[in-house]
């Protein structure tokens, strides 16, 4: 519905009323207006904030069902008025810094709730749904939408390696309702478990043999930094991921593939290893926790 101008205007009016109510209720005289939504410049300014912050986490103009041109125009207007801009990928940084200026734009990748996902290293019981699924297990957690997940790759690997079992956790069609999964459902080694509570994810990931980020190459994925990358890393499970731009700096910490055949070779390589470079993973994760990242962001805001 957000593609319709009337809906966008109505959303802004409603949100403005809610925010002004809470601003008065909590007596917020000099709030910092921090948004992930590029369509709310006037709303931010109505709060009379001490600083305006835009946190760019995805190329939203490349999302299905979005009025790309309207979003790009609104984002450009917003970027020119921001005091600080944070970006979660280098492609987003390059885009935003051209409009907002490099002195205002800062690159910080996505992060992990380490305390939560590191629970996978503890003695958690195996979920009942997994007990009858053979090993090796290739796991994925996230939105099961075709612009985010390469379903053709998953089907190909399932057919070529019938002894490998895919475990897919997430809502089908999130952000893309037309997504279909009939071809996946008919394969005995692809297990669609549906969405799970956030609190239970470590319990499932603990029993994966390989964590996968099998995204397609497109305008959306070219600018995303997968939240699940550091979440998987915090569990100390090996990761194989598509060679998207945002992960180019961390290829030493996971297996990166470009072709479908590389994926199969990568999984075989991972499964043949008895140990992995846990120390490198631990160092990377420590640099990319919510606590570490917020401290760095607050320093930027205070400067």
Language-model-detected regions and their locations in the chain:
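A charged, aromatic-enriched C-terminal amphipathic alpha-helix characteristic of glycosyltransferases
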Residues: 275-302
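Nucleotide-activated donor-binding/catalytic signature segment of Leloir-type glycosyltransferases, i.e.
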Residues: 170, 178-202
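Carbohydrate-associated surface elements
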Residues: 91, 108-120, 208
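Conserved donor-binding/catalytic core segment of Leloir-type glycosyltransferases
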Residues: 130-148, 155, 167
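Membrane-proximal helix-turn-helix segments that form the acceptor-binding/catalytic region
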Residues: 17-24, 68-85
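Acidic anion/phosphate-binding donor-loop and adjacent secondary structure
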Residues: 62-68, 97, 112-130
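Nucleotide-sugar-dependent
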Residues: 146, 199-204, 211-233, 241-251
């Amino acid at each position: 519905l957000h593609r319709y101008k009337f809906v966008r205007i109505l959303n802004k009016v409603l949100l403005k009323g809610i925010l002004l109510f809470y601003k008065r209720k909590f007596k917020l005289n000099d709030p910092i207006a921090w948004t992930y939504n590029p369509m709310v410049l006037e709303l931010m300014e109505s709060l009379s904030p001490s600083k305006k912050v835009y946190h760019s986490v995805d190329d939203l103009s490349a999302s299905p069902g979005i009025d790309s041109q309207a979003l790009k125009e609104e984002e450009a207007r917003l970027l020119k008025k921001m005091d600080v801009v944070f970006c979660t990928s280098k492609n987003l940084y390059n885009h935003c810094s051209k409009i907002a200026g490099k002195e205002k734009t800062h690159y910080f990748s996505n992060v992990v709730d380490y305390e939560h996902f590191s629970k996978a290293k503890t003695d958690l019981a195996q979920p009942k749904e997994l007990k009858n699924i053979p090993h090796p297990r290739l796991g994925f957690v996230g939105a099961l939408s075709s612009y985010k997940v390469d379903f053709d790759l998953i089907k190909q690997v399932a057919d070529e390696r019938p002894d490998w079992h895919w475990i897919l956790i997430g809502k089908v069609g999130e952000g893309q309702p037309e997504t279909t999964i009939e071809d996946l459902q008919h394969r005995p080694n692809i297990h669609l478990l549906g969405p799970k509570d956030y609190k239970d994810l470590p319990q499932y990931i603990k029993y994966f043999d390989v964590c996968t980020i099998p995204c397609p190459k497109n305008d959306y994925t070219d600018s995303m930094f997968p939240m699940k990358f550091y979440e998987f890393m915090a569990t100390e499970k090996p990761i194989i991921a598509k060679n998207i731009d945002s992960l180019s700096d961390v290829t030493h910490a996971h297996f990166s593939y470009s072709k479908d055949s590389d994926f199969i070779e990568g999984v075989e390589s991972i499964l043949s290893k008895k140990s992995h470079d846990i120390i490198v993973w631990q160092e990377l994760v420590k640099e990319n926790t919510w606590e570490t990242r917020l401290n760095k962001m607050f320093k930027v805001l205070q400067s």
